[in-house]
């Protein structure tokens, strides 16, 4: 019977974007400028057989990559229409009040920031493996490991991954529209519409984030989790807690039932926090350094 079972096709890269520039780029002070006409060939391969097997959050990340690729391509194809110097800032009246030389980095600054955020933000999502990962602790005063506590963490990890992918996709759409509107004069959006887009994005982020706190409802605690909750009722803060006698690496604490808390007393928890810190630093450095390039 196994011979007749449907086979899942081998997964390869779900998204491939090839961008070729003709002619070659030459250095122009800080940045790059095209020698003459820019020909952009974008070839996107989406394997239909593989897409149904991609996780929903991965499909959203792939869609975000497509949006950024399309925005980059459109700016390059409309390069001759972009003014020099290129506007890089808009004041409260909706008028451009900041300009920089027309270079690729200056014309796509918002897209670059968005790409960095797309790469960094998913690293802030707690990996699902933390839920059932345990470490050895002295048996004398060890807290019990709990199956329901692990399931609670898993559900919150899944919900966080879903919310983060939705935010990344919405951010890609927003940044692509705003970047094109800023640098291409004939597709410039009214300032009030840009404010509406920002407001809609913020409302959407709040709306999808509220779903995380309700994702672990319906899980009845077992005896081990009740013991843990009693011992850890005063622990935790800012998504972390330190309990050397807890064999579990992550938990949902009674003080904040809608949030995953990572046990910083153990190495896996510390490694995850370093990953989050590196992601935040990468975003901050990009936002600070890019305006000076």
Language-model-detected regions and their locations in the chain:
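Juxtamembrane boundary at the C-terminal end of a transmembrane helix
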Residues: 285-293
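Active-site and channel-lining beta-strand-loop segments
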Residues: 75-107, 249-253, 259-262
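Alpha-helical transmembrane segments and their helix-start/interface "positive-inside/aromatic belt" motifs
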Residues: 51-67
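Membrane-proximal soluble regions of multi-pass membrane proteins
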Residues: 216-265
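Select subsegments of transmembrane alpha-helices in polytopic membrane proteins
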Residues: 60-64, 158-172, 269-276
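Membrane-water interface of transmembrane alpha-helices
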Residues: 119-142, 208-221
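Alpha-helical transmembrane segments
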Residues: 101-122, 190-204
């Amino acid at each position: 019977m196994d011979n007749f079972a449907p086979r899942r096709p081998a997964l390869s890269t779900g998204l491939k974007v090839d961008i070729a520039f003709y002619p070659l780029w030459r250095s122009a002070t800080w940045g790059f400028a095209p020698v003459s006409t820019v020909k952009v060939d974008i070839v996107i391969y989406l394997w239909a057989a593989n897409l149904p097997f991609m996780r929903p959050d991965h499909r959203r990340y792939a869609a975000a990559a497509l949006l950024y690729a399309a925005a980059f391509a459109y700016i390059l194809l409309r390069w001759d229409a972009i003014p020099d110097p290129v506007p890089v800032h808009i004041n409260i009246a909706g008028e451009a009040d900041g300009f920089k030389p027309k270079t690729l980095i200056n014309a796509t600054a918002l897209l670059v920031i968005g790409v960095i955020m797309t790469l960094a933000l998913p690293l802030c999502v707690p990996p699902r493996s933390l839920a059932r990962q345990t470490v050895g602790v002295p048996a004398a005063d060890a807290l019990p490991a709990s199956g329901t506590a692990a399931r609670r963490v898993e559900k919150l990890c899944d919900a966080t991954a879903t919310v983060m992918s939705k935010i990344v996709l919405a951010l890609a759409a927003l940044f692509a529209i705003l970047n094109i509107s800023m640098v291409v004069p004939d597709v410039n959006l009214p300032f009030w519409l840009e404010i509406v887009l920002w407001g809609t994005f913020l409302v959407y982020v709040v709306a999808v984030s509220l779903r995380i706190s309700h994702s672990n409802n319906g899980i009845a605690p077992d005896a081990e989790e009740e013991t843990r909750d009693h011992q850890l009722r005063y622990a935790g803060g800012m998504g972390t807690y330190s309990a050397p006698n807890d064999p579990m690496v992550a938990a949902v604490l009674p003080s904040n039932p809608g949030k995953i808390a990572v046990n910083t007393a153990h190495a896996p928890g510390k490694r995850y926090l370093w990953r989050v810190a590196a992601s935040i630093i990468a975003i901050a450095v990009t936002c600070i350094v890019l305006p000076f390039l």
